[in-house]
Design a protein with these regions (language model features):
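Accessory nucleic-acid engagement/destabilization modules that flank
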Residues: 1-128
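A structural signal for short hydrophobic/aromatic patches embedded in well-ordered alpha helices
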Residues: 55, 80, 155-156, 339
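ASCE P-loop NTPase motor core, strongest for the SF2 helicase catalytic module
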Residues: 115-334, 340-361, 365-367, 371
Length: 371
């Protein structure tokens, strides 16, 4: 029958839902292959292929299906079926996240009535990363000489989970909340599991002494050496190599080994993607990457892109794609919301002002002195 004018004012009741990542993939990482299961939804009801065929056989207008009236539009229905074919099968985790939150295709997909939802495994995994208290406790390293606060234990669990999943991680806690001890705990666990592993820490020159002191204090069994100044030869027998940003720029030999973990302290040092230092560091191959910074965004959103280009390359697209995306942020506030949803599983940030983090700290006091 003909569609009446009052019906045309209603929002289309036909759309596609693509369920991604229902089960855990066999291999983990951003290139993990997830299942993609599209289904056609009419007024909240999923249709079988047989029922879809029945819809196509009906005349355009209103049709009676599953005890309700639905709009039959052959052209739109055919478009939806073509979209179903496009999504049916598998998709990489990186593409799944991009399509869910930040893809340039999202406007097209929405117009065609495509809704992407996370399946059970993907939903639970991202939920754990956004709230580390949901992650199952990882056993504390046997020889760690430190007592972790509850939020630090959550951070330790989170770093281990990120490593298990093959994701890069940004530990962005406020200064003073113990980013260093959380990372040392993670490294001590890695050392405990495999003493043949090799990790590279790149830190400001002013922090070399502090890292050495903290490792000696909290993980005295861990073998490490400092690569700085005249000491410019890698020690193959050491678990950890600690060097500076300046040395990382000069020593191309750091790029000749695939490190088990690459860690940047004060990672805002790579905020400018165009510098030689940033480009050199991003060339260092590694299985896992950690960025430590209290300021993941210092000046503008391009800082965030450079950080994620190091941590999880391709997640935020190319520099040009991301620049075009950020232009929409001021005009459309929902775009910044999408971006936050996109990066939040990979950034762990706790604040000293949050009493749920440290309840025994006194309130912050600010004193203004006029000079």
């Amino acid at each position: 029958c003909r569609v009446p004018n009052w019906w045309k004012k209603k929002y289309s009741s036909v759309k596609i839902n693509v369920n991604i990542g229902e089960k855990k993939p066999s291999l983990l990482g951003f290139e993990s292959i997830l299942s993609a299961q599209p289904s056609l939804i009419v007024n909240g009801h999923a249709l079988t292929k047989k029922e879809i065929s029945e819809l196509l056989k009906m005349e355009e207008g209103l049709g009676w299906l599953k005890g309700q009236w639905v709009e039959i539009n052959h052209n739109k229905l055919q478009q939806l079926l073509e979209q179903m074919e496009k999504y049916d099968g598998t998709i990489s985790l990186k593409d799944a996240l991009t399509k869910t939150y930040i893809s340039d295709e999202d406007n097209v997909d929405v117009d065609l009535g495509v809704q992407i939802s996370n399946g059970k495994w993907l939903r639970e995994t991202l939920g754990q990363l956004k709230d580390p208290s949901k992650i199952r406790n990882k056993a504390k390293p046997k020889y760690l000489k430190a007592t972790l606060r509850p939020y630090q234990k959550n951070g330790y669990n989170w770093l281990n989970q990120m490593n298990d999943l093959g994701f890069g991680a940004c530990l962005a806690d406020d200064m003073g909340l113990g980013k260093t001890i959380q990372v040392i705990s993670f490294l001590e666990k890695m050392y405990e599991n495999n003493k043949e592993s090799h990790v590279l820490l790149i830190v400001p020159a002013s922090l070399l002494g502090n890292w050495s002191k903290e490792i000696d204090k909290f993980a005295p069994r861990m073998t490490y050496h400092i690569l700085h100044g005249k000491t410019n030869i890698l020690d193959e027998d050491c678990f950890a190599t600690i060097t500076t940003y300046g040395m990382a720029l000069r020593m191309e030999c750091l790029q000749e080994r695939v490190w088990d973990c690459l860690i940047l302290d004060e990672a805002q040092a790579i905020k400018n993607p165009a510098t030689k230092q940033t480009r050199a560091i991003k060339k260092i191959p590694s299985q896992m990457r950690i960025a430590m910074t209290g300021t993941p965004i210092e000046n503008d959103l391009s800082n965030l892109w450079s950080l994620f280009d190091f941590l999880n390359k391709g997640l935020l697209g190319s520099a040009t794609d991301f620049k075009n995306y950020t232009k929409k942020v001021q005009a459309y506030p929902e775009y910044i919301t999408k971006l936050k949803m996109m990066v939040s599983p990979f950034i762990l940030r706790r604040l000293k002002t949050d009493k749920s983090i440290i309840s025994d700290l006194p309130d912050k006091m600010e004193i203004t002195e006029h000079v």
